[in-house]
């Protein structure tokens, strides 16, 4: 019961794919930790999400969570930016994933790349509390490609790198063939 209450109050999930949202909720129900706070939104477009109903649900959920926490360091707004202690994310990456130009333009890092995995780094940074932690799956190209040096420099300016874990090529879908790492910031 304690785990379920904690999950309902403190754990949030956002996904652009409505089927993955449903799968996550079902997984939570089966694990016995509730099914609240899983939303179908484009994480890169916060706070201008297309579905105003989802945005209102998120605002209400954050407000409920803040009311229960009684966190005196928190400014008690329903804006999600700066509210998360930890973020765990596996952003979409690959040639098929495109970000609309008007969304990409919101991000400083779009000067260097409009790839969603690059923009997710900055989007998550904006959602974290000062001192918050993040674990993000990234293609190794970001970590070693000479063209992404400005992105790595931005990461170093804004985060402390805690660990980088190489993942097996088979870690995700078979035959995807993208070498990736789990970066702890």
Language model segments and positions:
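Conserved beta strand-loop-helix elements of the APE1-like EEP
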Residues: 179-185
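Conserved S-adenosyl-L-methionine
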Residues: 160-170
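SAM-dependent methyltransferase catalytic region
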Residues: 1-157, 161
């Amino acid at each position: 019961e304690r785990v379920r209450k904690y999950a309902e109050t403190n754990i949030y999930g956002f996904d652009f794919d409505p089927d993955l949202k449903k799968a996550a909720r079902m997984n939570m129900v089966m694990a016995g930790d509730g099914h609240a706070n899983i939303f179908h939104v484009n994480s890169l477009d916060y706070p201008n999400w297309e579905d105003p109903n989802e945005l209102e649900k998120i605002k209400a959920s954050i407000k409920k969570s803040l009311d229960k926490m009684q966190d005196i360091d928190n400014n008690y707004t329903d804006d999600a930016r700066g509210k998360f202690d930890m973020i765990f994310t596996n952003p979409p990456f690959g040639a098929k994933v495109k970000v609309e130009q008007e969304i990409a333009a919101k991000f400083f890092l779009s000067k260097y790349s409009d790839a969603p995995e690059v923009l997710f780094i900055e989007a998550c940074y904006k959602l974290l509390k000062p001192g918050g932690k993040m674990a993000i799956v990234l293609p190794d190209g970001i970590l070693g490609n000479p063209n992404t040096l400005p992105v790595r420099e931005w990461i170093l300016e804004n985060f402390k790198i805690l660990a980088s874990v190489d993942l097996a090529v088979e870690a995700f879908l078979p035959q995807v063939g993208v070498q990736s790492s789990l970066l702890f910031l």
